[in-house]
Amino acid sequence: PSCIMNQSLRAKLYESSIKACKAVNYVGAGTIEYLVDNDMNYYFMEMNTRIQVEHPVTEMVFGLDLIKNQILSHAQIPLPNWMKDIKIRGHAIECRVNAEDPSKSFMPSPGTISSFHMPGGNGIRVDTHAYAGYFVPQFYDSMIAKIIVHAPTRKEAIYRMSGALDECVVEGIKTTIPFLK
């Protein structure tokens, strides 16, 4: 969760988001983004009517399976009213591992991955399609993995992510791992 979020702001954002969805008859998984100023005033930025890349952070903190709920919603199967029972559980952080060279202004780093090891363990999730032998093409989406960590506190989540990044091994191409550390 955002380090500036409090219960009052969360409730206001929730109500505004519900109103926005009802106003356009939107049903399904999605994200509404807001900007918050120094006085805790919030401003609508955009609505994404799709699952976001960052959805694992929400899943870990709220204990929900957003993909499952999206499928149920599109199948017109009523979703449980989980908002009344939802509880925030700790903090989660996501780092995107990209095939880019941070020392060269994040230039693309195509090539064959010769060695590939991602972290694991309690509170660590890795979403990836890459593997040793995978060829990262020149014209591509540079993200090769997402590392998501969950812990009881923000400080512990940062510590867990630091350890997870230290466990990563990607050889044969340059990645953003050194930058993320």
Can you say where each PLM-predicted feature lies in the sequence?
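ATP-dependent carboxylate activation and anion-phosphoryl transfer catalytic cores
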Residues: 1-181
